[in-house]
Swiss-Prot record:
Keyword Transmembrane: yes
InterPro entries: PHBA_efflux_AaeB/fusaric-R (IPR006726)
Signal peptide: none
Recorded family membership: Belongs to the aromatic acid exporter ArAE (TC 2.A.85) family.
Listed PANTHER family: MULTIDRUG RESISTANCE PROTEIN MDTO, P-HYDROXYBENZOIC ACID EFFLUX PUMP SUBUNIT-RELATED
GO function term, MF aspect, one: transmembrane transporter activity
Organism: Salmonella typhi
Full protein name: Uncharacterized transporter YdhK
Keyword Transmembrane: yes
Length: 679
């Protein structure tokens, strides 16, 4: 007994925490209920209800609601498209094939073009149409089209309802609590990030930390969406939460700007590091106030009016303190449940994002070509299991066109299908042939699914494999009503599914997604185009919108293995963002002195000469940097205080642009170019 006790403790059932048990039981009961209800509703393929319940098994209430709404909308759209296409083209195989391939290719483009629920809905509409329409090629009566379509949609809705009901019975962590906790943690992490970036060193760890902070803030936007659906309180506070995310992005920009000034400041005060550490320690306290912070940073107040570098750093540091204290106060009010009208915060739109249209179109073309090749082969050889291959190929192309590593995902799916083929053969022809009642089969499924759900949570490295095994198990076991046990059909169908995924893998290998270097160049060019727009009199993006758009560009390569492409995308984003903040500050800067106003306009025109959508002009850049330095030195000796403030702003612009002196040549990102990883 002593020997067996440690072994029992290492089993997934004894290792599981209460939260893991709640998650596993909730999802397992939902899947079993979905299968049961689909059977009693006499739906012909009830396993789709079980699969639908597995797909919407999100760990939070808001995630389940938002995912369910997207799934219902996508299923209805896909079913409608399948009915229209099949109803008009079913007697013409080639027209049917091209129409379906075009629709699923369009859905692939759309899910890459949009984000969150809209992207998920288009994903569902693409492979729902494939699930419904491709098996229709074997039907004889046209009236069966409606029966098949409504059965698939009903099965999906049954699974969603069961998943939602179990989430209400066994609820998990509140989305609002998760969002507020993430906001508070990020608020505290920004101080640690400031302490790291304001060091004089330049290492890869700084660049990685900057990318990590940007990615985490943008990820919190997904938590905001889930909280929006989970509780009416967060729907009322949605604009405020958006503003908080923008403020955290602005704090990140200010930290980067202060770092750039410290690196370009020849003689900073000797006590600057000591004062900064005291400041960060005070800001980390829950009850930090403006008076105490002002006393701490007072030793850094510039004494020489002509020292524009010191003045620029001082003004930006004060702005950072004010913004951080304001965010702390607003976070406290939101967490304490204060009424919306008592929280004085500037309402801002949602975070902006950029769509790589070239990559989205290429993904749609790849899907169209893949389905056309498989369909042509099926028609040419009269392959009865061709619909199965087409369905899995459609699912693979739609799902993995937007992931960072499609080959890894497709290889994992292939591994899943092989394992499920072997397992489903044993279950179907070893167990199910001996079962006469549904409850007997559920007695087998329940402990199996509970164990698989627990293993998915306890084995993070294999979570993707366990998740796919759970989702695809229903379609491989194929629990139909009435049950069918035909070994030849079983073998052909499973082979077709594996072949469909294999051809999809081949399509990704031939019609490869753009390399990270190519994507980086496209993002950099889009950044420059948007920045040139910022220099116009009436820019299309506000300061906050351009900031969030820039950070969205930077985050697109956060998982890339091409360090050079990531580094230059981050550098361009930081440079253009710092320059845009200076431009907006120059616009807001006013003086009664007409010569000073003309100097301000000259600085903005110098930026237009340096920057274009295609590249940065190196000769004008060097001349511009010299001219900006000359302007700063001249204004420093001006008798008006406004001139000193203008010199400080222009020096910030000089610090930001100096990073581009080693920019790579147009259209290249070659490792041969000298680059320093200064984030």
């Amino acid at each position: 007994m002593k020997l067996s006790l440690p072994a029992l403790r290492n089993t997934p059932w004894f290792k599981a925490t209460s939260g893991q048990w709640r998650y596993a039981l909730r999802n397992t009961i939902a899947m079993c209920l979905a299968l049961t209800f689909a059977y009693y509703l006499n739906l012909d393929e009830p396993y789709w209800a079980m699969t639908s319940a597995a797909v919407v098994s999100f760990p939070t209430v808001g995630g389940v609601i938002s995912k369910s709404l997207g799934r219902i909308a996508g299923s209805l759209l896909g079913a409608t498209a399948a009915l229209i296409i099949a109803g008009h083209t079913l007697n013409e195989p080639w027209l049917f094939l091209f129409s379906m391939a075009a629709w699923i290719g369009f859905c692939t483009w759309a899910c890459a073009h949009f984000t969150n629920n809209a992207a998920y809905a288009f994903q569902l509409s693409g492979y729902t149409a494939a699930i419904i329409a491709f098996p229709m090629v074997n039907i004889v009566e046209i009236t069966q089209l409606w029966d098949i379509a409504q059965a698939r949609v009903c099965e999906v809705i049954v699974g969603i309802l069961c998943g939602g009901m179990m989430m209400m019975i066994l609820p998990s962590t509140s989305d609002g609590t998760a969002l507020l906790t993430a906001l508070k943690n990020m608020h505290a992490r920004l101080l640690e990030h400031a302490s790291l970036l304001w060091q004089p060193e330049t290492t890869d760890a700084i660049r990685s930390a900057h990318e990590g902070v940007i990615g985490q803030i943008l990820t919190m936007n997904l938590l905001r969406i889930q909280a929006f659906w989970s509780h009416y309180r967060f729907r009322r506070q949605n604009a405020l939460l958006n503003a908080l995310l923008h403020q955290q992005l602005r704090l990140t920009s200010v930290i980067s700007s202060l770092r750039r000034m410290l690196l370009n400041w020849p003689t900073p005060p000797e006590n600057s590091r000591e004062v900064i550490e005291q400041l960060l320690a005070e800001l980390a306290k829950p009850r930090a106030d403006s008076y105490t912070v002002a006393r701490i940073i007072a030793p850094l107040c510039p004494q020489d009016e002509q020292d524009y570098r010191h003045l620029a750093f001082w003004q930006r540091l004060r702005y950072f303190c004010q913004l951080y204290l304001r965010s702390s106060r607003q976070l406290y009010l939101i967490e304490s449940g204060a009424p919306v009208d008592q929280i004085h915060i500037r309402r801002t739109p949602g975070l902006a994002r950029h769509t790589d249209n070239a990559e989205a179109i290429w993904s749609g073309v790849r899907t169209f070509c893949t389905l056309t090749v498989i369909g042509a082969w099926s028609i040419g050889v009269q392959w009865e299991s061709g619909p199965g291959a087409l369905t899995l190929a459609a699912i693979s192309c739609v799902l993995y066109s937007i992931v960072a590593t499609p080959f890894k995902s497709l290889s994992l799916l292939m591994r899943t299908l092989v394992l499920l083929s072997l397992f489903s053969f044993v279950v179907k022809f070893g167990l199910m042939v001996q079962i006469t009642d549904l409850w007997q089969f559920l007695l087998f499924l329940f402990p199996l699914f509970v164990t698989m759900q627990l293993l998915k949570l306890q084995m993070p490295k294999l979570a993707g494999l366990w998740g796919q095994l759970i989702v695809f198990m229903g379609s491989f076991i194929a629990v139909t009503n009435p049950p069918v046990y035909d070994f030849a059909d079983f073998l052909n169908d499973n082979t077709a599914k594996i072949v469909g995924v294999a051809i999809s893998w081949l399509a990704f290998a031939i019609l490869r997604p753009g390399s990270d270097a190519v994507k980086s160049r496209r993002h950099i060019r889009a950044l420059r185009r948007d920045f040139v727009d910022q220099l116009s009199r009436h820019p299309s993006h506000s300061e906050s919108e351009f900031e969030s758009l820039t950070y969205h560009h930077v985050s697109q390569l956060s998982n890339s293995q091409d360090a050079l492409a990531r580094r230059w995308l981050l550098r361009w984003g930081v440079v253009l963002l710092n320059c845009s903040h200076v431009v907006w500050q120059l616009r807001a800067w006013e003086s009664r002195s007409d010569p000073l106003s003309r100097v301000r306009d000259i600085c903005i025109s110098l930026l237009r000469d340096v920057m274009s959508e295609r590249d940065v002009q190196q000769r004008p850049l060097a001349v511009t940097l010299q001219e900006l330095q000359r302007i700063c030195d001249t204004l420093a000796h001006h008798h008006q205080p406004a001139a000193h403030e203008l010199a400080a702003i222009i020096w910030r612009l000089h610090c930001s642009l100096s990073q581009l002196e080693q920019a790579p040549a147009q259209g290249t990102l070659s490792p041969g170019y000298l680059m320093t990883p200064q984030a």
